[in-house]
């Protein structure tokens, strides 16, 4: 994964920037780029369907255009991209940045975690509605093919999830060119419609949208549910900042993605103005019949790319949450040596697949799925706006009035969309919200339980001098070996070392007490990753620093010490780690009891520390203890 710090050194004429811009098209814009497949159709259906009048068509198009301008172009491209955590973007990175520098930690963390949990909830729907809406184009090709839509969509998604463990580096190289061709195609198709009915360009005037919104009462409010679908992928513009940097994302948005989307939505509006039927997918009706099948194939590929971006994003966010201590350790597999972002987390992959397939089978069509789509991502955007306001005021040092005016505009827009989407709660919106609440609860319970264990494990600090005196008095034998004792907190002598000497009456002549320190920044500078100090008598104290985007690998880190001339043999190291068995006894309240039981379940199913830190199993010695909570 390229670092933003390096990307920003390139200017617009640099080939690296052009290459990154092309790659960004394949990762960042999949969701927002495939929204034309279902957005305008959904808006017209919410407005009453049938044959809409000019006011409805122009008002709908105007609302879509200005939603893309305010949310995507202004909020995310112009503001959010400028607030990064050492080059990384996204709501968890923003939460970590603010909680590190400011005092309102509980509130910031609560908002950030809820936003992240909502992204998981939304991530189950995006692949389902995207792929389903693309395959539904077959119904226009031949009505008899409608019976094959669901099986084809299910087959595509099962295949997509099944290949994740193999990595997608090879086919991923084609994502950028394919999405570039996709945007050019939808832009040209839309332009054809605009040329045939140029009056539709007047929809760029926001008056059309505002008049339609405020003159139609409840209908104008409900229609915002459909309008919002055009911006559901906007959060990815910020979340993928660390992959590409600010310049490539801005260049591709304003240079290709944004104008192509505008032309396509206007083209669909022009088609409906001419009297096209709204019963079928309006997007496909823009295409000449001879090219319909190639467009269906291209649309399907584009939605697969959009789904891949969602899956990859879920893996990345899960790793961030693990490193920040909000989720238990899970097995992370690096699927490619070419990029650090190429990872696979099996549990996340299969749970996401089951949820996505369940939604497709349960709802059966993109039209029905639209009822469940939008509520979670609109809530996420609301959370981002809250954190954005804090960042403008506290980090940029804007006065509270200026910060309030800017963030207030975004807040009004986001809150309006969220309120409108709440009306879909009983029609399916409860699904992503329920998933988000479950995930948020899991993160809270894990973090709370982990802190409880840390308190229970708190031992009286034993100094190095007193430890050396005790082993000298007891006649402990020193052997010519190297031992590494892993600990999660800084202390002179960890309990595992005391227990080892007490039980075995022997100690290696080279002892490294290694504290694993997870930072609230994405990447640790190479020079700061390992700090080591010799305290005497063959005992070293070391601190291994890892950012929340990094995967700890202790043997690789210790190889650096060996290369620097330290007298250790990496092949002759024994690693000592603690292994806690947690059990619940005599909980005062029923709720407290079940929360503790859930934590114990998560703890028992977490990836063993030795696997997570890539320790060679034949060289690991676990020291167990029981802890009651």
UniProtKB/Swiss-Prot annotation:
One of its GO terms (molecular function) is potassium ion transmembrane transporter activity. The chain crosses the membrane at residues 20-40, 54-74, 106-126, 143-163, 171-191, 212-232, 253-273, 291-311, 343-363, 372-392, 400-420, 425-445. It is a multi-pass membrane protein. The keyword Transmembrane helix applies. It catalyses: K(+)(in) + H(+)(in) = K(+)(out) + H(+)(out). The keyword Transport applies. One of its GO terms (cellular component) is plasma membrane. InterPro entries: K+_transporter, K_trans_C, K_trans_N, Kup. Pfam families: K_trans, K_trans_C. It is found in: Cell inner membrane. Keywords: Cell inner membrane, Cell membrane, Ion transport, Membrane, Potassium, Potassium transport, Symport, Transmembrane, Transmembrane helix, Transport. Belongs to the HAK/KUP transporter (TC 2.A.72) family. Transport of potassium into the cell. Likely operates as a K(+):H(+) symporter. HAMAP family: Kup. This is Probable potassium transport system protein Kup 3. It comes from Legionella pneumophila (strain Paris). The gene is kup3.
């Amino acid at each position: 994964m390229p670092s933003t710090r390096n990307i920003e050194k390139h200017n617009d004429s640099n080939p690296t920037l052009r290459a990154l811009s092309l790659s960004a098209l394949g990762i960042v814009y999949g969701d927002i780029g495939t929204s034309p497949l279902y957005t305008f159709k959904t808006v017209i259906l919410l407005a009453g369907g049938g044959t809409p009048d000019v006011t409805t068509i122009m008002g709908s198009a105007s609302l879509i255009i200005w939603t893309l301008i305010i949310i995507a172009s202004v909020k995310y491209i112009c503001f959010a991209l400028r607030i990064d955590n050492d080059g990384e973007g996204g709501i968890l990175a923003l939460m970590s940045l603010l909680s590190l520098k400011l005092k309102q930690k509980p509130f910031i963390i609560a908002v950030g975690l809820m936003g992240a949990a909502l992204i998981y909830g939304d991530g189950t729907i995006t692949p389902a509605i995207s792929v389903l809406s693309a395959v539904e184009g077959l119904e226009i090709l031949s009505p008899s093919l409608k019976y094959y839509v669901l099986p084809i969509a299910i087959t595509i998604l099962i295949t997509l999830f099944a290949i994740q463990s193999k990595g997608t580096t090879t086919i991923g190289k084609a994502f950028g060119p394919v999405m570039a061709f996709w945007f050019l195609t939808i832009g040209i198709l839309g332009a054809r419609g605009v040329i045939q009915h140029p009056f539709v360009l007047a929809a760029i005037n926001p008056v059309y949208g505002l008049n339609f919104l405020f003159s139609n009462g409840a209908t104008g409010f409900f229609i915002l549910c459909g309008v919002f679908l055009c911006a559901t992928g906007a959060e990815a513009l910020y979340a993928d900042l660390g992959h590409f940097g600010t310049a490539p994302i801005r260049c591709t948005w304003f240079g290709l993605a944004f104008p192509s989307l505008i032309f396509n939505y206007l083209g669909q509006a022009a088609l409906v103005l001419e009297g096209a039927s709204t019963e079928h997918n309006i997007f496909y009706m823009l295409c000449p019949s001879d090219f319909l099948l190639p467009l269906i194939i291209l649309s399907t590929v584009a939605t697969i790319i959009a789904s891949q971006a969602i899956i990859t994003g879920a893996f990345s966010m899960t790793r961030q949450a693990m490193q920040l201590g909000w989720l238990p350790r899970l097995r992370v597999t690096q699927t490619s040596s070419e990029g650090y972002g190429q990872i696979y987390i099996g549990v996340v992959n299969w749970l996401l697949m089951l949820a996505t397939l369940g939604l497709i089978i349960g709802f059966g069509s993109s039209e029905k799925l639209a009822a469940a789509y939008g509520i979670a991502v609109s809530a996420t955007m609301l959370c981002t706006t809250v954190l954005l306001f804090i960042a403008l005021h506290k980090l940029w040092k804007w006065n509270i009035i200026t910060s309030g005016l800017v963030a207030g505009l975004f807040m009004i827009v986001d809150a309006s969309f969220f309120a409108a989407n709440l009306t879909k709660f009983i029609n399916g919106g409860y699904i992503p919200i329920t998933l988000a609440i479950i995930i948020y609860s899991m993160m809270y319970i894990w973090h709370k339980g982990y802190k409880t264990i840390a308190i229970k494990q708190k031992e009286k600090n034993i100094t190095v001098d007193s430890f050396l005196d005790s082993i000298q008095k007891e006649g402990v034998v020193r052997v010519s070996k190297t031992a590494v004792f892993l600990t999660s907190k800084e202390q002179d002598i960890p309990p595992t070392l005391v227990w080892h000497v007490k039980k075995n009456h022997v100690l290696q002549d080279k002892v490294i007490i290694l504290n694993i320190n997870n930072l609230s920044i994405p990447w640790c500078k190479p020079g700061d990753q390992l700090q080591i100090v010799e305290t005497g008598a063959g005992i070293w104290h070391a601190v291994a620093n890892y950012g929340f985007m990094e995967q700890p690998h202790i043997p690789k880190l210790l190889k650096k010490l060996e290369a620097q001339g330290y007298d250790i043999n990496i092949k002759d190291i024994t690693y000592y780690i603690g292994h806690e068995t947690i059990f619940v006894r005599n909980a005062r309240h029923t709720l407290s009891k079940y929360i503790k039981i859930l934590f114990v379940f998560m703890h028992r199913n977490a990836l063993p520390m030795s696997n997570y830190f890539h320790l060679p199993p034949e060289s690991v010695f676990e020291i167990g203890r029981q802890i009651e909570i």
